[in-house]
Every structure is written in structure tokens, then in C-alpha cells.
Amino acid sequence: MDVQIFPHRLLGADTTEKLLNRLEDISGVKRMVIHGQRLPPEDHPDRRIISVKGHEFELQVKTGRVLLEIEDEDTIADIKRVCEDLLPFGYDVTPGKYIRTQKTVTDEIKYGEDLDKVPEELIGLTDQNARLSERATIIKRKKEH
């Protein structure tokens, strides 16, 4: 099951970083994808390194929506609590199917013979128009003992 968080305004780097960290704390969240306008390649205050649970990566978009793959509907209440705390300007949380889980013909055209080398957790997370260096960053959830 997937959920879309649609903030009523674009998120800056600080808010994106806080939101992703709080969402990562929710045990029912399996994967997260951020979507938005690409930031200009030159100096921009939001094009910076952000940290999500100790994993650092360069934020390359002005966050307009966050897609989450979740385990069950009970997780939605936890997601809404996080949004209520961090997005006072308003937001919509909508369940649906947003993240692809199977390889497509487009993937085959994009990756060619290397398609079998694409990790399963990357399926549905990459921008087919992006260069390899700009593709998704996977943040692995630490196993709880």
C-alpha cells in the first residue's frame, strides 16, 4: 500500500530533512520517495547535503510531495501526526498506488542489458530522465534486534 503526502506549499531543505527523519521513525514505513522541481545546478540554498538517520545525500529537488510505501492502513494515523507537527500550512494525505514495484518496458529501454543488475528496492524509485549520478539514494532501515 502507498500513501502520498501533498504539502500545500513546496518544502525547503530543513523541513524536508525533518519530515524524512520523522517518517523514518515510523515502523510501518517501508520506502520513501520525494518528488518536486529540480533545483538549479548552481548555488541554491536548498541544494545541500541532508541527513536522514545518519545517511547523508544531496537534496536535488524542492520537495512538492512525498510518496511512502507502507505496511498497512494503521500507519496512516502515524503519518498524519508527523504531518500535523511539521506542516502547519496544510497538507493532504492520500492512500493509493504511487510507487511501481515491477520492471517495465521503459526500464528495459533505459537500462538495456543492465536491467537485471538494478536492485529490486530501486524499482519505481528512479527518474528515467535522470543521469545515473542523480538517481535515487537508498536508505536501508536498520534491523531491530
Swiss-Prot record:
According to the record, the signal peptide region is: none
Q: Which InterPro entries match?
A: Me_CoM_Rdtase_D
Which keywords annotate this record? Answer: Methanogenesis
Source species, domain of life: Archaea
Provide a GO biological process annotation: methanogenesis
**Which Pfam family is one of this chain's hits?**
MCR_D
Instruction: Give the multimer and partner information.
Output: MCR is composed of three subunits: alpha, beta, and gamma. The function of proteins C and D is not known.
Query: Which NCBIfam families does the entry mention?
Result: met_CoM_red_D
Which protein is depicted? Answer: Methyl-coenzyme M reductase I operon protein D
Query: What gene is this protein a product of?
Result: mcrD
